[in-house]
């Protein structure tokens, strides 16, 4: 049966709602669709805005590859199924089998910023399309964050991707612009706060949000800072918990809920329950007016307290907490990565990933990864 001759605009509108992984397969069915899916940046942005989103858990393998898992929270028995392995060939080596040693991954807009502690270079990678952009840095390090500036917030396709970062050796903020393919220094904008590793940072609507701390006469203050790639400025964001904390290294983590809200994992000390707080929907009209709601309170046994020091996901509607932790059993020589799912009843479901933990790497959860057709 021949395909109906639908108007081009209607076909584009329908395709923009098809999940990216299925759309990529459809591109081989006809040349117009192939051009639309692979060569049209405007459609890529429209598709990212419209397409259905999915939870994907990313974990580091021992060989520095990434495996991805789909998390299914429907039914009485939640699961985390392996969806496949991602490989990133390193063009620096002649042998195509050699791969870039990824230590940390930062996610924005369907793109992955992959960094290595031992390299003066990084790569931005779209795992779905295979597009990569390799970028030289001035020093080794992994405190880099991907985002975008946008002059007209109403035009989705007018996004300029950028990378912001700072080195441990100094207080300067560096910013890389994809359009100019160059780095520049932003002087005098870094707040007088201590910023921890990038797993305490997330991207939401193109901005980077990060937990920070400062030593005061009263002890240690906890702060949430946002970096706006359009204004190139940091700004404080209100927190729902007391600012005083024991340290920044405790059970304080950030995540993103369905690409619209921030989530905070907070535990004041080892004797306290862990609290999961979620903001209102953050968009261009929020203008710093952020409100928080506590959606979960977890009281787990002492041997499971390590769950509170990992990256996490939270399903606000189902009131479920998800994290990845590296465990070492008494009889084992190696650590293994495990996925944990905890409900509001504090019942813990443990899923063994079947993977040994990578030395020097934390098992990574991307807050909400959405496979996309986005171009850099």
Swiss-Prot record:
Protein name: Putative F-box protein At3g18330
Source domain of life: Eukaryota
Organism of provenance: Arabidopsis thaliana (Mouse-ear cress)
Short name of one Pfam family: F-box
InterPro entries on file: F-box-assoc_dom_typ1, F-box-assoc_interact_dom, F-box-like_dom_sf, F-box_dom, Gal_Oxase/kelch_b-propeller, SCF_F-box_component
PROSITE patterns noted in UniProt: FBOX
Positions of the F-box domain: 1-46
NCBIfam families per record: F_box_assoc_1
């Amino acid at each position: 049966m021949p395909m109906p001759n639908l108007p081009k605009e209607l076909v584009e509108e329908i395709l923009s709602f098809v999940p990216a992984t299925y759309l990529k397969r459809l591109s081989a069915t006809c040349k117009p669709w192939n051009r639309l899916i692979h060569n049209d940046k405007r459609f890529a942005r429209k598709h990212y805005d419209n397409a259905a989103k999915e939870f994907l858990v990313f974990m580091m393998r021992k060989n520095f590859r990434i495996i991805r898992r789909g998390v299914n929270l429907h039914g009485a028995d939640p699961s985390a199924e392996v969806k496949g392995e991602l490989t990133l060939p390193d063009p620096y080596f002649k042998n195509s089998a050699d791969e870039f040693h990824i230590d940390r991954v930062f996610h924005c807009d369907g793109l992955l910023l992959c960094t290595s502690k031992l390299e003066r270079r990084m790569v931005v990678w779209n795992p779905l399309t295979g597009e990569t952009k390799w970028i030289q840095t001035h020093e080794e390090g992994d405190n880099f964050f991907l985002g975008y500036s946008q002059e007209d917030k109403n035009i989705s396709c007018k996004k300029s991707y950028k990378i912001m970062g700072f080195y441990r050796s100094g207080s300067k903020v560096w910013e890389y612009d994809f359009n100019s393919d160059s780095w520049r220094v932003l002087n005098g904008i870094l707040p007088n706060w201590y910023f921890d590793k990038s797993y305490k940072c997330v991207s939401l609507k193109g901005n980077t949000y990060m937990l920070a701390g400062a030593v005061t006469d009263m002890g240690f203050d906890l702060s949430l800072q946002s970096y706006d790639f359009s204004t190139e400025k940091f700004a404080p964001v209100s927190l729902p918990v007391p600012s005083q904390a024991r340290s920044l290294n405790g059970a304080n983590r950030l995540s993103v809920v369905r690409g619209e809200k921030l989530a905070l994992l907070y535990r004041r000390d080892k004797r306290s329950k862990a609290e999961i707080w979620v903001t209102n929907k953050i968009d261009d009209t929020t203008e710093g007016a952020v409100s928080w709601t506590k959606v979960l309170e977890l009281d787990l046994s002492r041997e499971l307290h390590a769950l509170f020091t990992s990256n996490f996901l939270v399903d606000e509607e189902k009131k479920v907490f998800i994290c990845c932790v590296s465990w070492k059993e008494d009889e084992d020589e190696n650590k293994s990565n495990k996925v944990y799912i905890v409900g509001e009843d504090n019942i813990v479901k443990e899923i063994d990933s079947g993977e040994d933990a990578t030395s020097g790497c934390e098992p990574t959860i991307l807050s909400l990864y959405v496979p996309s057709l986005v171009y850099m």
